[in-house]
């Protein structure tokens, strides 16, 4: 496409936005939005600043694909444990790694085998492929550094960027994993099993605890519920390394930017294109996209609130072609309001609301909420309003220059096997293995990568006052 210098009117670039920008393929939509985009401006509000390409070029070349004003209504937290284990602990959920360990060991001691006679597993992971970032790498940042998810990086209060797998806190966390491995709590196959093996193992109900992302382990929970093993599903936890840290699962980092829809220089009528995008951002456009057609896909109750019939909900959940046939949530890449957001007159933009999430809790979740005195499971976490709004979006989502991405890849290719070696070695070998990994990272551009990433982030900082 770039080689031929020929483009469609609009393009959802995903990871190729930088290439298109550098080729001059995307037009700056700033003036078009100012003249023809009142709904675009309303949707993004103060976060319009984050749509700007950089401080050097404040043009807007994409509208973000991610939900604006997204509310986190469910979360896996920093790690997870089976509801059965939490129930046996009188629903006193762990907040520190030490408490997490004690709960896992206590449940294993009381239940060494499954009803089928298989050995229970304390913790397992999927670390033989790219999922190592999800189950081995990311939890280290969430638990040890108490950092929000910025990919392989942590950002300090001065907006300096650091590669996370060299911090003192992560050293302590991986030393803990090493001990769990040598004590037989961590699955000996955690770094060699395939992701399919991992999914099957977790879905069997044998694994007491996991350190995973909700989107990844949710497929296991669907199987567990179908098999009548609801108590073996998982509760997300606000676990951190130390008591003085605050887990940040609910911290709102603002609209995720980096991927989105843009208008190309080949578009003969960019005014028409921006008007189309503006319509999609309107209340009418958003309700049509998320809910469908009134009287067909949804109805209004006596209070003017939308609802879907049980038949429609079942169809949406079971028909693989539902989105394609109805158009509801089918065309990804366009700007949308996030779950849990409402119009000015109180109309929920999406069917996923606080009320719908609570209504869909399984029996273990409902019993847990009642026992802990929570309305929602997210009530056990620090709430969004407790955090300051950050002047940057999630770092992993930005379109980074190729040379910067290559620097990270070099570090990751060292850290992945290095961390596995740290965990699977003996406890006496840990310090030496850790120091060896850090030295290899240092010798392969660690400081240069951190400096380059810090400089990159500096171009993305916006005023949030």
Where are these regions (language model features)?
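Extracytoplasmic "Venus flytrap"/periplasmic binding protein-like
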Residues: 1-55, 84-95, 112-115, 130-132, ...
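Structural recognition of the beta-strand scaffold that forms the well-ordered cores
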Residues: 9-13, 28, 61-65, 78-80, ...
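Periplasmic solute-binding protein
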Residues: 17-24, 30, 49-93, 127-166, ...
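Short, solvent-exposed loop/beta-turn-alpha elements that line the ligand-binding surface or hinge
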Residues: 28-46, 92, 144-168, 242-250, ...
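Bilobed periplasmic-binding protein-like "clamshell/Venus-flytrap" ligand-binding domains
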Residues: 109-126, 287-290, 443-454
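Extracytoplasmic/periplasmic substrate-binding proteins
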Residues: 126-152, 178-347
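Conserved small-residue motifs centered on glycine
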Residues: 285-418
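Histidine-centered catalytic/metal-binding microenvironments
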Residues: 417-465
